[in-house]
Every structure is written in structure tokens, then in C-alpha cells.
A protein has these predicted regions:
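Conserved, mostly hydrophobic/aromatic
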Residues: 76
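Short amphipathic alpha-helices within nucleic acid-binding modules
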Residues: 83-91
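A common structural junction motif
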Residues: 93-104
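Conserved catalytic core of two-metal-ion nucleotidyltransferases
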Residues: 105-116
Length: 122
């Protein structure tokens, strides 16, 4: 089998999210505000950034505690039009207010950028 050489029209991106120790140290008011802000920040990624969300996964039932590195707590797999859109989506964590803080106090995001896998996807 020969590897495909064509370049896709979009970037395949895995956004990986990890909760910080501050999330676990926060009181109920801050946790509830963070959860609300997170939902609002990441709604309508298609309309705002042209991203097609292919799926998401939350592994918080088996991953307990802060996520300083791999494995992360949650993931979004998306086709994103370009690197600028990937950066803008990551910046949501930096820019979104949570009471007197920003999301990045409670959650971190990392993006892995590639292309669609050529095997095992059908």
C-alpha cells in the first residue's frame, strides 16, 4: 500500500483539555461559573471558526484529579480550516472570563494538528 500524498483542505485537530489544580481547589461558585463559561466559550465552533466537530470524549470517570500532562481529561476532534482558527480556538481558554479570573486558571488546552488518518477509519 502506498501512503496518500494529497493534502486535505482542512487540518485534523485534536484539542486536549486538562483540569488544573485550581479547579479542584475552587469553591462551588467558581466551579459552576467555570463550567458555564466553558460551555459558552466552545459553543458553535462551526459558525465562529469554520470548525467541523467530529467528536468529543470526556474520560473523567477513569481520569481523576488534575491533568498536568497526558492523559488529558477531555478531547474534541475537529476539522479546522487553518492554523489561525486553531489558535483562535485555543485562545478561548485564555480570553474567556470566569468571575474575576479566566478559564486558563481552571483548564488548559493543547492542540495536536495533523491530517486525516488513511487507515482504520471505515
Amino acid at each position: 500500500m502506498e501512503l496518500p500524498r494529497e493534502q486535505p483542505e482542512h487540518l485534523r485537530v485534536l484539542f486536549a483539555f486538562g483540569l488544573t489544580p485550581a479547579f479542584y481547589e475552587a469553591d462551588a461558585e467558581h466551579v459552576n461559573a467555570m463550567i458555564k463559561a466553558l460551555g459558552t466559550a466552545f459553543e458553535d465552533l462551526a459558525g465562529r471558526f469554520g470548525a467541523t466537530v467530529l467528536g468529543g470524549m470526556d474520560d473523567d470517570q477513569l481520569q481523576v484529579g488534575p491533568s498536568a500532562s497526558w492523559p488529558w481529561t477531555a478531547y474534541i476532534l475537529a476539522d479546522v480550516p487553518d492554523l489561525d482558527a486553531v489558535v483562535a480556538i485555543c485562545n478561548l481558554v485564555r480570553e474567556t472570563p470566569v468571575l474575576e479570573d479566566r478559564l486558563w486558571k481552571y483548564i488548559k488546552v493543547e492542540a495536536r494538528v495533523g491530517r486525516p488518518l488513511f487507515f482504520g477509519t471505515r
